[in-house]
Amino acid sequence: MDYFDINIIRTLKFLPGILLGLTVHEFSHAYVSNKCGDTTSKDQGRITLNPLKHIDPLGFVMLLVAGFGWAKPVQFNEKNLQNPRTDIMKIAVAGPLSNVITAIVLSWILALSYRIHPESLYTVLAEVFLYAIYINWGLFIFNMLPLPPLDGSHLLLNYFRKYPGLYEVLYRYGTFILFGLIIGSVFLKINLLPIWPL
C-alpha cells in the first residue's frame, strides 16, 4: 500500500467527524438565532442536521486538501432579535459549545464501548470516533479565537462596541491576522492554530 492509498484511507476516517462537527456547529447557530426571534435561518432551511444544508463545497474541499476550511455561515438579522446585544453572544457561542458537547458525548460512548469490549478500542470505528473527538475540540478552540469572522470575535467585538476606534481596528484587520495565522500554520508547518493535518 503506497502513501496515496494510506492518505485516502486516513481522509475517509476523518470525513464523518468533519461532517458531524460542521453540521452540529451550524445547526446550533441556526437553532439559537431562531429561538432569539430571528427566523432567517428557518426560512433558509438551516434548522436541520442535514449536512448538505450547511456544507460549503469550496470550504469542504479546502478542509480536506489544506487542513482548514469553512461551512456556510448562518445568517441572521440583528434587528429581529429580542435582545440584540446578548442574543448575538448566545448565537455566537452556540456553535463552539455544540462542538464541546459533541466531543464529550463521543468520548463517553467510546469509553463505554471500551469498558464493555476492551478490544473495541483498536478497531477502525474507534479511530473514526477519536478523529471526530479531535475535530470537534479543534472546531471549538479555533472558532473561539477573537478574530473576525470567527465566533469568538462576536463576543469580543460586542464588548468593544463601547470603543469605536478599537472596534473598527479589530473588525478591519482581524480577518487579515487570521488569514496570516492560517498561512503560517499550513505552509510554514508551524502549529499557530488548532488545525488538523489531513
Describe each PLM feature range.
Residues 1-198:
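Hydrophobic transmembrane alpha-helices and their immediate loop junctions
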